[in-house]
Regions:
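Basic, polyanion-binding surface patches
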Residues: 1-183
């Protein structure tokens, strides 16, 4: 195998496509696309964010949702990452999204995105948002035997090497199980 150097680049696979939902000071829903995020503890999510309308909203409400972008919503999810609510105040509706107020946090659940984390801001320093996960909810349509089923959810990931969105593949093994055969 021959390796090629690419230098220091943000190439990590897969990068989940996270759609952050907030309300502004007037209760108007806003959303943005963020790919640089991850679970950082059992009840914690960390997301790298520069200054946006969303970050201004977070300073006001301190609460947000993180929905998982899906194969069926690529165009809308990409749109909310391209357009700023500072320039297009109605971008939430223009994306075709509809909001239902979360009963756990002061933030919108996006009806078109079937899975969401409901979060409170723990800290936001040096462009790193750390949120406490208060609840995870999912539409029944993406469940199998009471669990979230990735095949039904159809989450997408961001491919930073090619600037594309890709689907998540098939099950190839059982976590915390298959490796036991080497013990």
């Amino acid at each position: 195998m021959s390796r090629i150097d690419f230098g220091a680049k943000p190439l990590l696979f897969p990068m989940p496509v996270l759609i952050i939902g907030t309300y502004d000071e007037n209760g108007v829903p806003n959303t943005m696309n963020a790919a640089w995020g991850m679970i950082s503890d059992f009840k914690e999510i960390s997301i790298s964010l520069s200054e946006h309308k969303t970050t201004a909203n977070l300073a006001v409400t301190g609460e947000f949702t993180v929905s998982i972008a899906t194969e069926d919503t690529v165009v809308a999810c990409d749109y909310v990452g391209i357009v700023s609510a500072n320039d297009e105040p109605d971008k939430f509706a223009k994306a075709g999204f509809h909001a239902t107020k979360s009963d756990k946090v002061n933030a919108p659940l996006i009806d078109e995105l079937p899975m969401a984390l409901e979060c409170r801001v723990k800290s936001f320093e040096d462009d790193i948002l750390i949120g406490e996960i208060v609840n995870v909810n999912a539409d029944e349509s993406v469940l199998t035997d009471g669990k979230i089923d990735p095949k039904k959810l159809k989450p997408i990931a961001y491919d930073p090497a090619n600037n594309t969105y890709v689907t998540i593949g098939d099950v190839v093994g059982k976590a915390f199980s298959d490796g036991l055969q080497l013990k």
